[in-house]
Amino acid sequence: SPRPDHHVYGVTVHAAKNETVVATTRGTLVSVERLMDDTYAVTLQHGNMVTSYRHIGHVLKQQGTKVEAGESIGLMDGEHDLVVELWDAGQFVNPEEVIVW
């Protein structure tokens, strides 16, 4: 279950190795970037909002792909926790107030 993380924007979700990361809403993957810890950040745009899924071990979709809510976008590596950030027109939104976990 998600828990607030005071070191980053968003919530941190503990995830086991090979656990599937799914899109929380319909949208388009606008960015897939490799992070310093050799995991990935995937950014999904939906209207004026974007959701960032950080520390994914293996990405299953390419940039530009349209996805539906619940569709798999990646797998966790078991060494990192998933961080989910939500932004509306550049302003942080607490994902726990919007996303049904």
Where in the sequence are the language-model features?
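Surface-exposed, glycine-biased beta-strand/turn segments
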Residues: 1-40, 68-69, 93-96
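Short, solvent-exposed beta-strand edge segments and adjacent coil->beta transition regions
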Residues: 8-10, 48, 81
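A generic structural motif
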Residues: 17, 33-36, 57-60, 77, ...
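Periplasm/extracytoplasmic soluble domains of Gram-negative envelope assemblies
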Residues: 17-18, 47-48, 79
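Zn2+-dependent peptidoglycan hydrolase active-site motif and core
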Residues: 24-57, 83
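Conserved, short, structured surface segments that act as functional micro-motifs
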Residues: 42-43, 65-101
